[in-house]
């Protein structure tokens, strides 16, 4: 079995539960605005938000364009006029409080950092990601954190990964594994950068033929087998 030395972890829905953080932040934002948040609006927000972030991954939009237009675009569909940038500021404050861990994340990361060099690779807003990682207790386990906002590039762009590789001492692509939940950002990005990839896929989403991960897992504990190490927590 291949021996890895460096592990690159995505954040949202890989080690931190972004779905829970997002749901809470949306509820608090709409309560603040005195606007009823319906299930239809939640679903439409996800559609709009995912589409905008996909455009960001493809280099078609900036991060500021994504976050400052998503709420105004959503509310316009329901007859509301809104200041998208102002709503984003309020939403961001609520979102930063969401640091619920994915099941098994703390034990896994605290174990792995004893044997591997761990790094964060994430698309998003720097202040938000740093705060959530600190509040979750995971921050000290990582040697460095690479947020797209700080690098000037984003996953899956090769320039993003080049930026990361240049800042990892004695970096070796052959001995590096990236773990993430996004086929387009993490898995495709890892492949373009010459890395082995591990797709975190708890919901058993269908794959696409052109993006085949090296490994696929349903829960984080499965990484112990891939990395050929003992799960000291369960023993």
From Swiss-Prot:
Single GO MF annotation: 5'-nucleotidase activity
GO biological process: pyrimidine ribonucleotide catabolic process
Record-annotated disulphide pairs: none
InterPro entries per UniProt: HAD-like_sf, HAD-SF_hydro_IA, HAD-SF_hydro_IA_YjjG/PynA, HAD_sf, PGP-like_dom2, Pyrimidine_5'-ntase_YjjG
Record keywords: Hydrolase
EC identifiers of the protein: 3.-.-.-
Annotated catalytic residues: 10
Enzyme class: hydrolase
Pfam families, per database record: Hydrolase
Family membership noted in the UniProt record: Belongs to the HAD-like hydrolase superfamily. YjjG family.
Designated name of the protein: Putative HAD-hydrolase YfnB
Organism listed in the record: Bacillus subtilis (strain 168)
